[in-house]
Amino acid sequence: MKEDYKIKFIRGATTASGNSIEEIEDAVVELIDELISRNSLSKSNLLSITFTATKDLDACFPASIARKCHGLDLVAFLDCQQMYVPNDVDFCIRIMAQVLLPSNNSVKHPYLRGASKLRTDRC
């Protein structure tokens, strides 16, 4: 019997150590690695990923890093600036990924580094 699949959404976030290409790359690679490993994803499961970054991160586009470092050429990516809120987490990169998973699979949302305080229930 063929398994039913559904489109599911996975949220997550991390923080970069600073506003350099290398620091952003390090954070994005770790976040995508965790997204994939925690949810047992393959490239074919990933449909799209939207990145947001706080206004203090402008050295590069997180999506270009994810596309390059993970060979995700067929995934739709979008970068946006996160809405500014005073006292928000600095150097924060958030994601929302659309994935195709078996209906009965639950998702695991990776909240890493300084972003773990955003969702203590999911860390």
Report the location of each language-model feature.
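Terminal domain-initiation and capping elements
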Residues: 1-123
